[in-house]
């Protein structure tokens, strides 16, 4: 009986898949898809996408099949993967509006009010209005400048907390959680107002974000194979996302006051008469895109500095030369430190926080390299592959901040070409809305921590691990644990 049931189930699955394939075949046959690895029935190229991280696998496949190739996630869900800067520029910049649609797993509807936020919604009046409201209000330059003293206060408190924690653990600690919560505080003031001071909220958002990252790794299989929606593992993921979303609602709802300060994101959201669901989704999005992109990138940078003491001391000297050792580094100093900027860029080159960017979808019939691309075609840009092109970045797997310093071009490559090929925040009309704030907070955090502490291996002679976690964003498999020594004690 059980064997018969298994046969019936398998037959239904195969028939369903073939029916879907036949249904889709008419829509995809009118377009000449770029060549790619040979696909198998039903599963497409899924058998070739395991093992290493997704962006690494695709970068290796591009070396064989070309920098513009088609990958089939399931036999009826093709996507074009671009691993070349010129083609990426055509998609992201030159034909930005043609490729400005989005392609997200169904599960993301739960936390985005049915894709009603900046990152998930297709381009159009709603998207333009929401993006303009964020950038022109909470993230307006003068409003960000008004945060400088509070950022510096937060950093002073963070350094004190880190020193106290490390002193109880033989000088060793993990910096990631400290930097995440520092970023949550900054973003909360921009969303709700400068009077924000709720550590329970900070801890709650931190936990919710960690849970969403953990769950995100299971999100896409059911999009490739709809019958997977009934698998217990997928149902569990759906249930967990609903639970996290409910926790976020309970955290944010008490802050949905009628008259928030005029320079906050909440003021703009209220002015648009959005539902609470859309407002909470927009608030969560700021944390979701802003916290890990800032904190995790700073920790990647610290990891490289532990592994490269020469670079760390060169950066420390630049900071002290600017401050004279008479004061702490300030937020406004970030733009005055060229080697700091080079370290930041080299970290984002080697470890872009979104190595496959956010998936794009064509909003109309268009073209790529002169060939027709149908409306609704999924596009992914492999930023990791672009950032590791040896023709642009000599010795691409080595951490060399000097490549981004003016005057070093002859030794490390064409700096103009390298700058154009560096796309950690994507490019074009869908470039990250919070890019400038993210770079500022990232740079200030990194400079402050290098100024305050000397960072060394937690265990003498054992360099920190650079392994990557296999998820949508580029996190460390084993977050940095390092020994910190206050510079005042050296």
UniProtKB/Swiss-Prot annotation:
<protein>
    <recommendedName>
        <fullName>Cheilanthifoline synthase</fullName>
        <ecNumber>1.14.19.65</ecNumber>
    </recommendedName>
</protein>
<keyword id="KW-0560">Oxidoreductase</keyword>
<keyword id="KW-0408">Iron</keyword>
<feature type="binding site" description="axial binding residue">
    <location>
        <position position="432"/>
    </location>
    <ligand>
        <name>heme</name>
    </ligand>
</feature>
<keyword id="KW-1133">Transmembrane helix</keyword>
<dbReference type="GO" id="GO:0004497">
    <property type="term" value="F:monooxygenase activity"/>
</dbReference>
<keyword id="KW-0349">Heme</keyword>
<dbReference type="GO" id="GO:0020037">
    <property type="term" value="F:heme binding"/>
</dbReference>
<dbReference type="InterPro" id="IPR017972">
    <property type="entry name" value="Cyt_P450_CS"/>
</dbReference>
<keyword id="KW-0479">Metal-binding</keyword>
<comment type="pathway">
    <text>Alkaloid biosynthesis.</text>
</comment>
<keyword id="KW-0256">Endoplasmic reticulum</keyword>
<dbReference type="GO" id="GO:0005789">
    <property type="term" value="C:endoplasmic reticulum membrane"/>
</dbReference>
<keyword id="KW-0812">Transmembrane</keyword>
<keyword id="KW-0472">Membrane</keyword>
<dbReference type="GO" id="GO:0033075">
    <property type="term" value="P:isoquinoline alkaloid biosynthetic process"/>
</dbReference>
<comment type="function">
    <text>Methylenedioxy bridge-forming cytochrome P450 involved in the biosynthesis of isoquinoline alkaloids. Converts (S)-scoulerine into (R,S)-cheilanthifoline. Catalyzes an oxidative reaction that does not incorporate oxygen into the product.</text>
</comment>
<dbReference type="GO" id="GO:0047053">
    <property type="term" value="F:(S)-cheilanthifoline synthase activity"/>
</dbReference>
<comment type="similarity">
    <text>Belongs to the cytochrome P450 family.</text>
</comment>
<dbReference type="GO" id="GO:0005506">
    <property type="term" value="F:iron ion binding"/>
</dbReference>
<feature type="transmembrane region" description="Helical">
    <location>
        <begin position="2"/>
        <end position="22"/>
    </location>
</feature>
<keyword id="KW-0503">Monooxygenase</keyword>
<dbReference type="InterPro" id="IPR001128">
    <property type="entry name" value="Cyt_P450"/>
</dbReference>
<dbReference type="InterPro" id="IPR036396">
    <property type="entry name" value="Cyt_P450_sf"/>
</dbReference>
<dbReference type="Pfam" id="PF00067">
    <property type="entry name" value="p450"/>
</dbReference>
<dbReference type="InterPro" id="IPR002401">
    <property type="entry name" value="Cyt_P450_E_grp-I"/>
</dbReference>
């Amino acid at each position: 009986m059980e064997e018969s049931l298994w046969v019936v189930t398998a037959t239904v699955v195969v028939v369903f898949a073939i029916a879907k394939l036949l249904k889709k075949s008419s829509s995809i046959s009118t377009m000449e898809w770029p060549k790619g690895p040979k696909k198998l029935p039903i599963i497409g190229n899924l058998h070739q996408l395991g093992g290493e991280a997704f962006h690494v696998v695709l970068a290796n496949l591009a070396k064989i099949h070309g920098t513009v190739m088609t990958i089939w996630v399931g036999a009826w869900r093709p996507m074009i993967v671009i691993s070349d800067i010129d083609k990426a520029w055509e998609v992201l910049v030159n034909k930005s509006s043609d490729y400005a649609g989005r392609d997200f797993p169904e599960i993301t509807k739960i936390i985005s009010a049915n894709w009603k936020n900046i990152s998930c919604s297709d381009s159009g009046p709603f998207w333009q209005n929401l993006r303009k409201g964020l950038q022109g209000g909470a993230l307006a330059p003068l409003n960000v400048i008004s945060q400088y003293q509070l950022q510096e206060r937060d950093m002073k408190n963070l350094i004190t907390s880190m020193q106290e924690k490390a002193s109880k653990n033989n000088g060793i600690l993990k910096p990631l959680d400290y930097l995440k919560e520092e970023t949550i505080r900054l973003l909360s003031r921009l969303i709700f107002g400068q009077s924000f001071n709720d550590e329970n909220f900070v801890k709650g958002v931190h936990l919710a974000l960690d849970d969403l990252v953990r769950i995100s790794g299971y999100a896409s299989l059911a999009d490739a194979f709809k019958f997977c929606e009934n698998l217990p593992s997928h149902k569990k993921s759906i249930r967990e996302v609903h639970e996290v979303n409910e926790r976020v609602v309970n955290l944010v709802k008490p802050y949905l006051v009628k008259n928030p300060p005029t320079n906050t994101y909440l003021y703009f959201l209220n002015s648009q008469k959005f539902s609470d669901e859309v407002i909470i989704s927009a608030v969560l999005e700021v944390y979701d895109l802003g916290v890990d992109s800032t904190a995790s990138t700073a920790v990647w940078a610290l990891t490289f500095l532990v592994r490269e003491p020469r670079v760390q001391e060169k950066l420390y000297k630049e900071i002290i030369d600017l401050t004279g050792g008479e004061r702490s580094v300030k937020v406004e100093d970030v733009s005055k430190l060229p080697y700091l900027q080079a370290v930041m860029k080299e970290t984002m080159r080697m470890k872009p926080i979104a190595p496959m960017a956010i998936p794009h979808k064509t909003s109309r019939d268009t073209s790529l390299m002169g060939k027709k691309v149908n409306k609704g075609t999924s596009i992914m840009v492999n930023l990791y592959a672009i950032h590791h092109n040896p023709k642009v970045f000599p010795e691409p797997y080595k951490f060399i901040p000097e490549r981004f310093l003016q005057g070093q071009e002859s030794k490390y490559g064409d700096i103009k070409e390298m700058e154009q090929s560096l796309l950690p925040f994507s490019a074009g009309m869908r470039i990250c809305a919070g890019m400038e704030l993210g770079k500022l907070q990232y740079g200030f955090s990194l400079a402050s921590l290098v100024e305050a502490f000397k960072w060394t291996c937690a265990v003498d002679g054992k360099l920190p691990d650079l392994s990557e976690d296999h998820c949508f964003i580029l996190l460390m498999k084993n977050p940095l644990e390092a020994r910190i020594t206050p510079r005042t004690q050296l």
